[in-house]
Curated annotation (Swiss-Prot):
InterPro entries xrefs: UppP (IPR003824)
Cellular localisation: Cell inner membrane
Keyword terms: Antibiotic resistance, Cell inner membrane, Cell membrane, Cell shape, Cell wall biogenesis/degradation, Hydrolase, Membrane, Peptidoglycan synthesis, Transmembrane, Transmembrane helix
Membrane topology reported for the UniProt record: Multi-pass membrane protein
Top EC class for this record: hydrolase
Pfam families xref list: BacA
CC annotations in GO: plasma membrane
Miscellaneous comment in the UniProt entry for this protein: Bacitracin is thought to be involved in the inhibition of peptidoglycan synthesis by sequestering undecaprenyl diphosphate, thereby reducing the pool of lipid carrier available.
Protein name (database record): Undecaprenyl-diphosphatase
Described function: Catalyzes the dephosphorylation of undecaprenyl diphosphate (UPP). Confers resistance to bacitracin.
Catalytic activity: di-trans,octa-cis-undecaprenyl diphosphate + H2O = di-trans,octa-cis-undecaprenyl phosphate + phosphate + H(+)
Length: 256
């Protein structure tokens, strides 16, 4: 992988990792368009740029994260379903990975967002701060996050949907989703890096480093912009976007 490809994929990862649109789907499509070889190193590269995106959330929310143990306890509770199911079903989840799965998950997730916004258009949300989230809500959101083990579902998408159903307002649902990414993705990416460490070499460290830094920068931009957007608008544009992207996926990859 050359530096140009590393920059492009870093931008795509950073912009999409925390939006409810499936970063996996975007990385697959862009890699196909650029003709990037889907080898073992490519998998390791994707894991490393995910790590860059995660660190952006740590940087942006550092004050809240270090304000007390309560938030960490809630994140730990929310992580339990994904941690347990991920450990038990790791091989089965990896076997689900296919472009067709991603495409259909994108479309279905888009429909869910549209239906949810229609049903909740006049709803008064009962939880208007991350601090007001209870442990039961945290655990329930954790089960929604487990759905993201299906490729294309989007981790942020599934947790935001869960938050909205449980009564979190849009911004709080997004913020808790971002915070929950920290334990979830640190552990998942750490394990995957360990499993794929044999693909690392001196020759490809520059691409890894560039992609990591680019993903970090663009993830910070995306998270800030997304929170501003969702404070004023709803998730309908993301639902429509997911459906369109899923259809493009199906046509481009000759799945229909």
């Amino acid at each position: 992988m050359d530096i140009f490809h590393a920059i492009i994929l870093g931008i795509v990862e950073g912009l999409t990792e925390f939006l409810p649109v499936s970063s996996t789907g975007h990385l697959i499509l862009v890699s196909e368009l650029l003709g990037i070889k889907q080898d073992d190193f490519h998998k390791t590269f994707e894991i490393s740029i995910q790590l860059g995106s995660i660190l952006a959330v740590l940087a942006l929310f550092r004050e809240r994260l270090f304000s007390g143990v309560d938030i960490w306890l809630k994140l730990a509770v929310a992580f339990i379903p994904t941690g347990a199911l991920g450990f038990l079903l790791y091989k089965h989840v990896k076997a689900l990975f296919a472009p067709s799965t991603v495409a259909y998950a994108l479309i279905l997730g888009g429909i869910v967002f549209l239906v949810l916004e229609w049903l909740h258009k006049d709803k008064e949300y009962k939880i208007n701060s991350v601090e007001s989230i209870g442990y039961k809500e945290a655990l329930a959101i954790g089960f929604f996050q487990a759905l993201a083990m299906i490729p294309g579902t989007s981790r942020s998408g599934s947790t935001i949907v869960g938050g909205l159903i449980l009564g979190l307002n849009r911004k709080v649902a997004a913020e808790f989703s971002f915070l929950l990414a920290l334990p979830t993705m640190f552990i998942a990416t750490g394990y995957d890096l360990y499993k794929n460490s044999h693909t690392l070499s001196i020759e490809n460290l520059s691409a890894l480093g560039v992609g990591f830094v680019v993903a970090f920068i663009f993830a910070m931009i995306a998270v800030k912009g997304f929170l501003k957007f969702i404070s004023r608008f709803n998730f309908v544009p993301f639902g429509i976007y997911r459906i369109i992207l899923g259809i493009i996926f199906l046509f481009y990859l000759d799945l229909i």
